[in-house]
A protein has these predicted regions:
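Pepsin/retropepsin-fold aspartyl endopeptidases
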Residues: 1-130
Length: 130
């Protein structure tokens, strides 16, 4: 069985998630190899941080340091794991400027595959295998 969700935006693929019982918006990024949660939400969402990630990450927002995160996000009731916590303010600002939506994190392609997520980009639909 498959659950279908509509993206919160037509400009970017954004889904609603739950992190520690609170709603969050995650940008789906098929070009990302790691999932990121904003370091700006770590207190409010009570993120459990681990050790410093051993490498610098380079992305659209530049180069940055990240920490392992031991907190899951749930999308359509399915757990999404393996997030890092980093400063994603530049990416979040770009998304907010384009869509008016505040994101709390970025879900990577490996995470989407792990959660059984498929994308219909033409109709901005996200299908999740249950």
């Amino acid at each position: 069985m498959t659950m279908t969700m509509k993206s919160l935006s037509d400009e970017r693929l954004i889904v609603q998630a739950v992190i520690n019982g609170m709603g969050a918006n995650l940008l789906l990024d098929t070009g990302a190899t790691v999932g990121l949660l904003s370091d700006g939400i770590k207190r409010k969402y009570k993120l459990i941080l681990g050790k410093k990630f051993p490498r610098k990450l380079v992305g659209a927002g530049g180069e940055f340091t990240a920490y392992y995160c031991h907190t899951f996000a749930y999308v359509g009731g399915k757990p999404v794991t393996q997030f890092l916590v980093a400063d994603i303010d530049n990416v979040a600002a770009s998304v907010r400027e384009q869509t008016g939506i505040e994101i709390q994190g970025i879900m990577s392609l490996p995470q989407m595959k792990q959660a059984g997520i498929q994308i219909d980009a033409n109709d901005n639909l996200i299908m999740i295998e249950e």
